């Protein structure tokens, strides 16, 4: 084994000198396992980041360097950080190094481990067909459909329903498609991760999910690499098992933020707004591995924090370049009791074109957006002058727009324990048919409230019958 000694410690960045001229490669994992004089054991992993010359490498620690001293012996493992992959990861919670951090014991030693650093799939391996991923959530499937193997950005503030939407997507894909999900908490609040784990355990979704966390309190090295740990687990399900995998990353901004911290500690010259000069490269290396191949697909849903609501900030701007669809959650809609609170006018998708979704779906989606846009324009007039001042045509637009707005809401399976109402999965063809019939005026005589928090249009008719009885 190639051994060296610690020569300098600067917080999470540690320099190690190797004698004999044999240096570990970039990205190799180095380990320290020893006890201190006071009896506390130090068990650390570093990742090689730079070769400095004079037989010295600069490394980034994956956990706190408290108690580490100069002269400590360090061992080169000869390979990159490797994490468990395969069915043994399902229902479990891991840290960046692939160590289990739940209460179900260690992962068996014979479980296969893969390195977290690898190349994106070769050009000829990529799948060229664009296929829609049916989520069973009406507003998503109709107005901003997700692409299998695509990347989706989920924008929203605190408490507007990002987590519930994520859970429902995990649930629907597990139930309807038998799919597997990987959740990577990057720079997450520990409390949120804990809540998510317990909520998923209660709803039974956890059995089809692997979870990886690098929380806010961890060093930047761990927060920067934890997304790659989750991605490596997802890649195994895609490449070795031919699965269509869902990869959730919350929050992709924290990945960039951790990279910025590491870059400064490594002594690189900062670029715009203090970010790392390698921002676009690091983001590209992560995002290009998330794709569809001839074997299977990884569809990634990423929560995106926008610093100070500035979309021109280099971090969100770099993320935008990789996204195929955006789902915007709006607080105003939660106040109206419309869940999921997806903004139908601000959410976008590359897949919403007649060639991909079909002519009928495209036409219905555009008419829905036009009706809602017109309603939005009329709201000022209604607020000042009231409904009576509108033309008959505009009154009809408002009448239908309100029904559409309520019909975009839906009961979720994962929210059954709160609402007491059964969740619903709506196939795309039923969604398109329902909205088409509303636009044609088929249900103009039904009360507005019949459209609230329902699945298909049949449920609306049932609700209306009960109300009118």
UniProtKB/Swiss-Prot annotation:
Q: What class of enzyme is it?
A: translocase
Instruction: Describe the family membership recorded for this protein in Swiss-Prot or TrEMBL.
Output: Belongs to the ATPase alpha/beta chains family.
Any single Gene Ontology cellular-component annotation: proton-transporting ATP synthase complex
- Assembly behavior: F-type ATPases have 2 components, CF(1) - the catalytic core - and CF(0) - the membrane proton channel. CF(1) has five subunits: alpha(3), beta(3), gamma(1), delta(1), epsilon(1). CF(0) has three main subunits: a(1), b(2) and c(9-12). The alpha and beta chains form an alternating ring which encloses part of the gamma chain. CF(1) is attached to CF(0) by a central stalk formed by the gamma and epsilon chains, while a peripheral stalk is formed by the delta and b chains.
Q: Which organism is it from?
A: Bacillus cereus (strain AH820)
Q: What is this protein called?
A: ATP synthase subunit beta
Recorded catalytic reaction(s): these are: ATP + H2O + 4 H(+)(in) = ADP + phosphate + 5 H(+)(out)
Claim: Protein transport is one of the keywords in the record: no
